[in-house]
Every structure is written in structure tokens, then in C-alpha cells.
Amino acid sequence: MNASEFDKFAEEYRSLHQANIAASGETPEYFAEYKMKDLRRLVSTDLGNVDGGRFLDFGGGVGTSVPFFRKFFPSAHLTCVDVSVKSLEIGIARFGSPTSFVAFDGDQLPFAESTFDCAFAACVFHHIPPEAHARLLGEIRRVLKPTGRVMIYEHNPLNPLTVRTVNACPFDENAILIRAGALRTRIESSGFREARIRYRVFFPRPLRWLRGMEDNLGWLPMGAQYYVWGRK
């Protein structure tokens, strides 16, 4: 999906997303918070105290992650970058300062080398042509500090409910889902090290009493989503 396609859906992004995930019984905010909880845990384990640290939300769009980033990283600074100017305008109107919202051309990130402590992308790369992944992962790596980390969250194409949901989603029309192993290979080929996979999001709301098990199921390739976590 290009910038104009994202712009087209920007105003109704949340309502479309909510309708699309109705079978889960959850809201877009539930999934956004889920990801930020994972990021908090990973950062605490690998980087420790990141008070005053700088984080990059690659493909941050309308800013869905922002309130939950602020909840789990109250002393850190977040920059949301996206190709969709319209989405960024909505993010600014909703959340504004101290979060930064920055447009980029889809080619080169407008930041100096070693700017950020950590970068994350929440279900973004399946919208990007596979041939562009290496270049953009390289850009993310370039703007990370030498000790930087990256978390790439994606939909799991091995989960049939995920595939059905993506196929029915208007803004996923041109999506190409990525297997976890393939994404890890691309991340490591871009220069990141020690990339590891964890499968996530196993139980819909009617089965929420089972969610306490999810942290022990990261090895099982049937979660609705997964992340790859790597170091520069």
C-alpha cells in the first residue's frame, strides 16, 4: 500500500479496524497495549533503564501506540514516522506533544545515524513490497544507537483466523503476509544480530481466562501474531 492508499483510509482507520477484528471480541487499543507491554518487558530485560530514551514507531500512522507507549515508557520520547501525511495529521490532532510525528518518503528515514535507542513496527511490513524490506530494515538499523534494539510485530500467516481477517480487511487489500522465519532471516540479513521469534495473541476475549498461559506459548506457531526482536 502506498501513501495515497493510507491517506484514503486515515479518517476511518479505527472504525474499519474495529469492524475487522470483531471476532476477537477486542478493540484496536487492546492489541496496541499488548504490543507495548511486550516492548516494555523486552526493553527492561535487554536495555534496562531507558528514562529519557528515544524510540521510533516505524509506520506509526494515526498514533494508535502513543497512549500505551506513554503508559509504559513515561520518561522516554517517541517519534512516529509514516509515509501517510494524513495519518500523521490525525495523530497530531489526537495526541500531539511530546510525541513527534514525522513524514518520510518511504525510502530514507529523515534522521541521523545512532538517533534512537529502540525501534518498533506494529504490523507494518506486510504492507511493504518484500523487495523493499532489506533497504528499510537497513534504514532502521542505521538510525539506531550501537546498543539499539528492534521489535517487528507481524500477522502470522500460519493462523487461519488471521489469514481470514486480513483477507477481509479493506486496508490490507495488497498485503503480503510474512512467515516468522522469513522475517527473521531478512532482519539478520540486514545486519541485526540474535534475532528471536515469539508467537503472541492466542486467545480471543471469550477465552480470556486462558490468557495467563500466553507467555508460555511463544514457541507455538499458531498465535495470531508474532514478533521478531533483534539487536544492532
Tell what function each PLM region has.
Residues 149, 185, 195-232:
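A C-terminal cap/extension of S-adenosyl-L-methionine-dependent methyltransferases
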Residues 56, 62-108:
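Class I SAM-dependent methyltransferase SAM/SAH-binding core
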Residues 32-51, 68:
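Conserved alpha-helix/loop element of class I SAM-dependent methyltransferases that forms part
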Residues 1-21:
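N-terminal, positively charged/glycine-rich alpha-helical extensions of SAM-dependent methyltransferases
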Residues 120:
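A conserved beta-strand element that flanks and buttresses the S-adenosyl-L-methionine
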